[in-house]
Amino acid sequence: MGAVMLQGTGSDVGKSVLVAGLCRAFVRRGLAVRPFKPQNMSNNAAVTIDGGEIGRAQALQAIACRVEPHSDMNPVLLKPQADRTSQLVVHGRVRGTLGSADFREARRPLLDEVLASYRRLREQCDIVVVEGAGSPAEINLRAGDIANMGFARAAGVPVVLVGDIDRGGVIAAVVGTRAVLDPADAAMIHGFLINKFRGDPALFEDGYRQIEALSGWRGFGVVPWLAATARLPSEDAVILERRGGPAEGRVLVACPILPRISNFDDLDPLKLEPGVELVMVPPGRPIPAEAALIVLPGSKATIADLAALRAEGWDIDIRAHHRRGRAILGLCGGYQMLGRRVADPEGIEGPPGAVDGLGLLDVETRLSPAKTLRRVEGEALDARFDGYEMHVGETDGPGRARPFARFDDGRTDGAIDPGGTVMGSYVHGLLANADLRRALLARLGIEGGGRDYAASVDAALDAIAEEIERHVDVDALVALAQAGG
């Protein structure tokens, strides 16, 4: 049939959730749908059915389409490693590391690869729902663009512009985007959506009509604030504010927000647990002394994040927590930090060198160019699980004699200290498994793990689709996709 693309008046206007919601709304109409994002920048990634990696947002959108995530859904992924360098992933595989200035030139030849992925998806479905990146209004980035209008024009995909009314100034944002675009780019936009509206939509009716009059574009609807979004995997390491200690009967789980934190949505399943209070600890604050569990998350730059952790004094908090006999769980990069040493002799993450780890697990990590990407199934803490590995380097040492997990293929993963309170694993997605979550929480003295996280996410996608169906002219978007793309 065709395709439709959502672009935004800026970053964080809610494109990812709207794409997921539209994908599910189209699926509910009996259509075969695929998500697509030409270029993404994120350290939150997922392993695909073809053994590659894509942004977690596109993996969620695939779930909304009721299909397996595939590397074609996000052919170009940039994973920031430092302020001015990113790892370049193309078709799910690492191509190298680029500086921010280098990418402008490097992206030009990538358009053909992006279009090849898009065309393969087109052959599989009725509608491709495409998500842009940032905003087409960033006209300083237009030359060589593959994420927004560069892709839309090359593929002939009609565009709908998304504006975020919650942040204010949405009329200026939509009309201003129209004003700065090249006429040929502006011609690709066939209408707009207003997102994140709170209150009575009748109060914005005049503003909505003014946008139509000033831009010359039709409106496709006003989407309300979607409460069900809170039940979806996080796109950002949201700081959950604490007021006093944990509520009676609840235990506190704390996770420090590291500069290059990755796959922090590993912790989202804990939000389902009524007996758990999850707190993401921002820089400048101590890890709460009353925490029952500290989780060290994944990292795109383990050595740099380990230095940042020490600069915050969090290593002192972690050691004090350990002396109190409380639990610590390190995931991927966090697991590497818990060991005695992290070595990077080939300069994978930065200048070659090695640093001492926290020394809470008797293992050492050696980073190397080869990247491990695979889905896994196995048993840990006497519970079944599935998940995925996504890491560079290998970890070994005497502590590996007490592995955290055993995979079905016979391999082992991670380590547990002799006291059983410090645990490390390379597996992402562990806590999404209800039985394993229940086993971990039992170690903290609470009963949990009763809710199916995947079912909760699926129900949230249905709820978002229902809201979109009530407030958006979905039939008109289907017709737009059929007419173009």
Swiss-Prot record:
The keyword Transport does not apply. InterPro entries: Class_I_gatase-like, CobQ/CobB/MinD/ParA_Nub-bd_dom, CobQ_GATase1, CobQ_N, CobQ_synth, GATase_3, P-loop_NTPase. PROSITE patterns: GATASE_COBBQ (PS51274). SUPFAM superfamilies: Class I glutamine amidotransferase-like (SSF52317), P-loop containing nucleoside triphosphate hydrolases (SSF52540). The keyword GTP-binding does not apply. GO terms for biological process: cobalamin biosynthetic process. The active site is at residues 332, 428. It holds the Pfam family GATase_3. Residues 250-436 form the GATase cobBQ-type domain. GO terms for molecular function: ABC-type vitamin B12 transporter activity; catalytic activity. Gene3D superfamilies: 3.40.50.880, P-loop containing nucleotide triphosphate hydrolases. Keywords: Cobalamin biosynthesis, Glutamine amidotransferase. Pathway: Cofactor biosynthesis; adenosylcobalamin biosynthesis. NCBIfam families: cobQ, PRK00784.1. Belongs to the CobB/CobQ family. CobQ subfamily. Catalyzes amidations at positions B, D, E, and G on adenosylcobyrinic A,C-diamide. NH(2) groups are provided by glutamine, and one molecule of ATP is hydrogenolyzed for each amidation. This is Cobyric acid synthase. It comes from Rhizorhabdus wittichii (strain DSM 6014 / CCUG 31198 / JCM 15750 / NBRC 105917 / EY 4224 / RW1).
